[in-house]
Amino acid sequence: MMPLLDKLREQYGVGPLCSELHIAPSTYYHCQQQRHHPDKRSARAQRDDWLKKEIQRVYDENHKVYGVRKVWRQLLREGIRVARCTVARLMAVMGLAGVLRGKKVRTTVSRKAVAACDRVNRQFVAERPDQLWVADFTWVSTWQGFVYVAFIIDVFAGYIVGWQLSSSMETTFVLDALEQALWARRPSGTIHHSDKGSQYVSLAYTQRLKEAGLLASTGSTGDSYDNAMAESINGLYKAEVIHRKSWKNRAEVELATLTWVDWYNNRRLLERLGHTPRQKQKKLIMLPSETMIWQPEFTDKTLSRKPGAVQ
């Protein structure tokens, strides 16, 4: 509003303009003084300006997906002491908010082949790295058709150990994600848990698991809770990357996914690791020091009226 008053004051005068806008002329002059003499502003106003820059930086550096809670936690990690309510207030003024998760779309096509038993029973618990992996895939709509993205996650630290993109839902693309994970981790005796999708219960996939010394496990048909951790990663991926823009082609999705996986594995704050990135938890990830129990990301209290807000 002040720039508008500055523009019209010569033509109409400050008094008449303030009268029409129901503002006291003293308010206008006070704002003018603060703009021209920033050092005369209150300590709180000056600190707010500085905090806004820091909040915007943290928000931009983390793919613009963080809500109040994670922005606040990141600021604390950097040694910036600030109250959570202050971050919430300033983010509201700046128009910044965490991304919202969308509804899940069914991609599982069950196959009538004999599937492995459920070795997990919804207990996503791991005492060491590579004790339990979960796998699933999701889809992305592009201008040139659908793209499918498969992930394999190590439950111990929530680390994405393998992923792959494809233009079709054939078994080969989930096999490629598995091969990447096997090459990266060299596991032995790992439980591999998935849904009963035709790709995961196919002869080729189950045979490769057996050759690699992995123990196959599948949840029940049509029940997302039986593979809840993998579903949660899919939800984060869709909310933090896919739902934020339209996509031209597979190459564009692949580059964005590569960037996100690197950020997710190394820099994204994780609540169950004490709001620290996995990169800072190398010892925790590599040593079987304690049992890790998977928990879904919780929404911020400030966004409690918007279920599914990713913080």
PLM regions: where:
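Charged DNA-binding/catalytic regions of mobile-element recombinases
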Residues: 1-281
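N-terminal, intrinsically disordered charge-dense segments
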Residues: 279-283, 306-311
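N-terminal amphipathic/hydrophobic targeting modules at extreme N-termini
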Residues: 286-287, 295
